[in-house]
Amino acid sequence: WSAANRSLKFRSARLSPLMTKVLVSDPIDQAGIDILTQVAQVDQKVGLSIDQLKNIISDYDGLMIRSGTQVTSDVISEAKNLRIIGRAGVGVDNVDVPAATRKGVLVVNSPGGNTIAAAEHALAMILALSRNIPQAHASMFAGGWDRKKYVGNELYKKVLGVVGLGKIGSHVAKVANAMGMEVIGFDPFVSIERAQQMQVRLSDLEELFKQSDYVTLHLPRTPETENLVDIDLLRKMKPTARLVNCARGGIIDENDLANALEANVIKGAAIDVYAKEPLTENSPLRSVSQGLILTPHLGASTVEAQQNVAIDVAEQIRDVLLGLPARSAVNIPGLSAEIMDSLKPHLKLAETLGLLVSQISGGQIQKLEVRLQGEFAQHPSQPLVIATLKGLLTSALGDKINYVNASLEAKGR
């Protein structure tokens, strides 16, 4: 329903590819490009700087990116025609989502497209740490044959701590259980019942770090999680423990991790994501002499995952440009196409009622209360509330207000 206001404009008319333009600014699988060309002129311009993107973004109705493109508030402020930003992947920390919301630009991602790839990379890191595979490989190519030096550890009956039990973390837990590991988890949004279904014992964060032989991180980068894993938390780990991060950069304090490895505070770590990417040449991680495996953000880099996320996000961009709902909207509640179809006339009515209220109110409106009765009460309430807000604010903001930014604009008044 996120594009309901646009569907009212376009009705069932088809968009001409000559009228609509989509910019693809990161490498995207051809399957996704083929979908976009059904409804738009597609320009592929990879490696743009922020200034270059600012200079051209006003020409486009849609933007499709991966992790490389930085969609800052300055870029969004220049996006006069932009309706949707599609992130071919999960994390949207390279998009200023609040700025997009204020501008009325829908942001979508693909939360399930690279689940298997990311989970398998984390598991591969755990196995590589356990059996010293990178070090043994390098030794062989240097002419060595040292079996004693690279004696490893079995994962069977070891304790795996999973921080974040979303789609990726829960899949890691599933495979780890199958390998005979004991899995404990930390996730404040997961119930005891759900954890039991996953065969995961819930723990607080500090206890998880104390008890685990391996800790794997699967959580987003937010102000609350930035540098979450610092020297204090690392010191709570066993000296034989290993740490894996294939989630988002910036969750681990990289200086603290480098120091902890050099001082034998923990046995090892495997890192795929970094606070700043590409990883700088003078990063302290590049100077660690023992126990560290580094990969260049390969978590979602499989043929299958690249294709999955490209198709998923391209379909969402196509649908939104045609006035249909998006499956995985980040900055607005998502609804199925079936519910959207049933809601369309009610959304229009709610919008009209909001406009009527704005015209008959005698002064500044301090509070808006929406009550649903009868047939209305059978539908999800939030879309109807937002439609009412859109109508209410239209008289003051005109075309600047839409279903994406209506709630945010109302809260700011």
Language model segments and positions:
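Phosphate-binding beta-alpha-beta segment of Rossmann-like dinucleotide-binding domains, i.e.
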Residues: K103, P111-V159, V163, H171-A178, ...
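An accessory alpha-helical subdomain
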Residues: S328-G412
